[in-house]
Amino acid sequence: ASMLVGCGGNNEKVTAKVIDIDLTNEEYAFGVDKEQPELLDEVNDFIASIKEDGTLDEICNKYFSDGEPEAVKSAKLDTTKDQLVVATNAAFEPFEYTKGEDYYGIDMEIAKLLADELGKELVIENMDFDAVCLSVSQQKCDIAMAGLTINEEREEYVTFTDSYYSASQRLIVPSNVTTFDD
């Protein structure tokens, strides 16, 4: 998976190369309400299952290759129903984003499959990123699914599941650059 960012003002055609050194390594996981250890176990079992059977790779390939992303619908929150309430910030494509009323992204497709597996109706609560883990810790949502990097600060609010995605950052430079001084 890659994302390119660049700047420049001339029309000179320049080729680029990737420096094959990971600058950062991050593990993404979901954050579960600390008061729901059984949900944590169910989510970890689910992650293991979709890794093993290839479902996770299929979902990722939709967003990093030429696949067709699937729209995910959210039900309305209703405390009388058996629902899985997901906290997200749908502004981190390809993990979560919106088009109209529909949600898309790796995390959102996983959320739909997880809700189906648990026999629950899916509710997606879209909020500011800083509120995602907090809303789970306050039992307003069951699980945080927002392209979350595992870190100590967030662990104060949620219990992280097993990792489902590894990310790294690399430099992309003009192909004629041969040293870091360039």
How would you name each of these model-derived features?
Residues A29-G31, R170:
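Short aromatic/hydrophobic contact patches that present stacked aromatics
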Residues E70, P94-Y97, E152-Y157:
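A short, acidic/glycine-rich surface segment
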Residues K13-T24, K112, E121-D182:
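Acidic, polar ligand-binding/catalytic clefts
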Residues S74-A75:
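Long, compositionally biased eukaryotic signaling regions
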Residues Y28, E38-E42, F46, I50-E58, ...:
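Extracytoplasmic small-molecule ligand-binding "clamshell" domains
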Residues S2-G6:
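C-terminal motif of bacterial Sec signal peptides marking the signal peptidase cleavage site
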Residues G8-N10:
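Bacterial signal peptide processing site
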